[in-house]
């Protein structure tokens, strides 16, 4: 019986276990989870989130395990759902709900998987509150070290499914939080001048986490939200900061599963890749232009799409939003999106960009360094803005804070400096200086390199190759050095973002988990293409 270690029991680890059970061959599986409860995952745990924080994914998009998320919700007691402000009679498969509820779903599915595994004669051990502190490959197998006094054993395959990586809480102070997941949920933030770097959903969630310490959101039957500030919190002022000062749009209605693309097909992209890296980005952009024109000729004409190139397309995409007050734009966009949802109307240009991002991602490892930078500054920002559209409820709460005179948005521009001091954080632009009593960095996950791997033994072994990015096969097993090949499946998202910049979400977790499970029975037939620079 092969011995498998799964490090991390969040969504990627859960989908890996799910896929292993489909193979029917009994295995010995040890699951290591540093949190108190395996099967929840950091993004959905009650330790890292408040009831206010919404998951940016609906049931219709979540790969089901035993049942869909919606089916699971419909089986819950009314009183339990009401604790999260959810009414059973209003549930539907496109609804955005509190992250903690989604964590409960995954916990339930995980426990059922463990039971099923044992019924299928798998040997399963689950270690909770158990942090893997080191991982090393020896001739005998993969050895793990943990913070618990566990018997020494070796594994045939170790699956690294550790998910997002945020700064330790030890790096946070009373006045500075390096991420919203570095102690902010437990912290008492006084009514003061609060700065939040980032205007994505993470930034908005951080603002909500602060705001609910100083008042409450009230929603009427017409979905209008107001914020009632506590009398003792008059000094609360929240500023969202970013280079552009642009807010994300509200999540829009579209057909799911996605309709196929007509021009930017796998065949067309592979043909361009085969022509070589020189000019690849510009050639693919011409395909993108044709795809957008096919989907929405009117919008294409309105933005003069034919006159745009890789570098100017992003400017055209954001132009109208930059000219408007961000809150006015958000209110207008919210009204449009909600109308489209009621009418089940799809905006063609938004939908085609959404479908393009995963297809176009395939060219990223094949770009030369110059074009990779152009892609990151242009098209990538458009794609991210489009797929990271946020729940309407988050926009309503943001607008409620604005009506209450609490929240503001500041565009810093491209050139600014940040000074983190003991009592405050100061940001300086060419023209101004901004000081904050409390500062929260909510810019999201950054790509990580070999030097950032938290397991000293594995890190040292990989550093001998001289590669800055882990070299993984199509099943995500490490390919270099030779003595490691096929023995560690490296599915930790932050280390995959260099050549998969849009790898995120539960669909990606399921796909990676399925691929890593294949490593148990069949070695990778080929390595993934990866960046030759970074």
Swiss-Prot record:
Pfam families documented for this protein: NAD_binding_9
InterPro entries from the UniProt entry: FAD/NAD-bd_sf, HpyO/CreE_NAD-binding, L-asp_N-monooxygenase_NS-form
PANTHER family: BLR0577 PROTEIN
Protein name per UniProt: Uncharacterized protein YdhS
Organism: Escherichia coli (strain K12)
Organism placement in taxonomy: Bacteria, Pseudomonadati, Pseudomonadota, Gammaproteobacteria, Enterobacterales
